[in-house]
Curated annotation (Swiss-Prot):
Keyword Nucleus: no
Residues of the propeptide: 1-51
Phylogenetic placement of the source organism: Viruses, Duplodnaviria, Heunggongvirae, Uroviricota, Caudoviricetes
Coiled-coil regions listed: none
Pfam families: Gp23
Protein location: Virion
Domain of life the protein comes from: Viruses
Cellular component terms per the entry's GO annotation: viral capsid
Primary location group: virion
Alphabetical UniProt keywords: Capsid protein, Virion
Name recorded for this polypeptide: Major capsid protein
Organism name: Serratia phage KSP90
Amino acid sequence: MSKKLVTEEMRTQWLPVLEKKSEQIQPLTAENVSVRLLQNQAEWNAKNLGESEGPSSVNANVGKWQPVLIDMAKRLAPNNIAMDFFGVQPLAGPDGQIFALRARQGVGDASNTQQSRKELFMEEAQTNYSGDQTTVHSGDPSGFSQADIEGSGTEVSSYGKAMDTVKAEQLGSPTQPWARVGITIQKATVTAKSRGLYADYSHELRQDMMAIHGEDVDAILSDVMVTEIQAEMNREFIRTMNFTAVRFKKFGTNGVVDVAADVSGRWALEKWKYLVFMLEVEANGVGVDTRRGKANRVLCSPNVASALAMAGMLDYSPALNVQAQLAVDPTGQTFAGVLSNGMRVYIDPYAVAEYITLAYKGATALDAGIYFAPYVPLEMYRTQGETTFAPRMAFKTRYGIAANPFVQIPANQDPQVYVTEDGIAKDTNVYFRKGLIKNLY
């Protein structure tokens, strides 16, 4: 009697495993990021503000800054464009570490170091490495010959195969060594840096503002300083993205796309719609370069967003599935809408040049091209002038910023040595891709 391929005993044993849902690894969500920031803020408040609770009702009507700062910190985080484009990793101290774990062929020996070995998973898998190494792996990754692709040429594609039983039985012998793999864990540091603003005012201004306008100068100046710090941070992050992004590779010349020459279409509307195909191709290129995923964020000038909206490609109300006109407001929020291919579109409200920058951000806070590492959202200082006794106040914030470790840390970096630079260099970060748009209209 022939042996049954699948028995009832096998089904009883393995069906519960097959039917059980895999437990998902919970990522660091935006909510958790805010929780960590508020905790940092509360710890700073307790250590530095010196506000005591006071006995019973003695201080019942004494104003306190702790709840005010908590509210400001809560408002600050969601308005930060880094929350949409960067990975966010709150710091628990003034310095932090980030790591790049790279899988590699082989291990270090007397003739080479482990970090010099070829990295796995970033390129096509070498088909003969774990199999028969006497077979050749070369040519086009998909197996096409040069004649297939170009119409002429003699180069053919060859690929590795699995080893036969005789060679497999000899694995580990001097003539048939195992193909080996290993890992390197390379490390870099990120340090919190600061921004700060200061303001002072007279007692007379405080009294008159309250008497005539019913306004609290403390609250007004606090709001001004926090808003200015937030605006400067957003501009830093936008400029950082555009500075470090690589240029478009498939369209245009050296990252400059001329709509009149490089984009297909009979009139403006068709060309604006073709822009979406262009974005899709370049977004796929981000996925190829990073091996993480295709670009899913767009940062562009207001006029580019308006062109996409006029072409009917932006859905401002995706929950209702309604194609609505998009009113791009350069003075309003940076979020503009959702492209028909699912990409979220944000505008650079101060852009003069017409441009598009694509970015990839994954489902977790570790999966992005740049890391934003906030430490203390807001530090507040209050004092009085030494001769005028006029009120003075200042705000500071502390945060770090660094490129993804796979961008920041060179592939051949010695694992025993820390990288102390932030990895923000011109045209180097493959998680972002930029293009200037000429002759948009």
